[in-house]
Regions:
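Acidic, low-complexity mobile loops and tails
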Residues: 1-54, 84, 88-122
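Short beta-strand "wing" residues that participate in macromolecule-binding interfaces
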Residues: 57
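Mid-chain, well-packed structural core segment of small domains
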Residues: 60-93
Length: 122
């Protein structure tokens, strides 16, 4: 399945029973150079829309929102050592965490690429 997007500029990539989550090119571009990422704890459960982490850049700090309800199954430890991955490969190596959805239908309700492009004007 292709990526889905939120209005808060997170992306979701379904991968079997889990979904990877990160920030979009638009988000990392607006933030500038990312210098720190606070990730959620593995095993933490979140409702859709809850703050799940923080990304800090040279320009600002921004909350990372949980795009779907579920439980965090894995975090990207590489981001702790190299937060710039959120800039250099936001849709790949710069993923933030993986979540096991508690309401998988929420993924279908997120924006597709065309809707997100219309939102961001890109």
């Amino acid at each position: 399945m292709s990526l889905k997007y939120t209005v808060e500029h997170e992306w979701v990539r379904p991968e079997g029973a889990v979904a990877s989550v990160g920030i979009t090119h638009h988000a990392q571009d607006a933030l500038g150079d990312v210098v720190f990422v606070e990730l959620p704890e593995v095993g933490s459960a979140f409702e859709q829309g809850a703050v799940a982490g923080v990304v800090e850049s040279v320009k600002a700090a921004a909350d990372v929102y949980m795009p779907i309800s579920g439980t965090v199954t894995e975090v990207n430890e590489a981001l702790r050592d190299d937060p710039s991955l959120a800039n250099t490969d936001p849709l790949g190596a710069g993923w933030f965490f993986k979540v096991q959805p508690s309401a998988p239908a929420q993924i279908d309700a997120l924006m597709d690429e065309a809707a997100y492009a219309a939102l961001t004007g890109s």
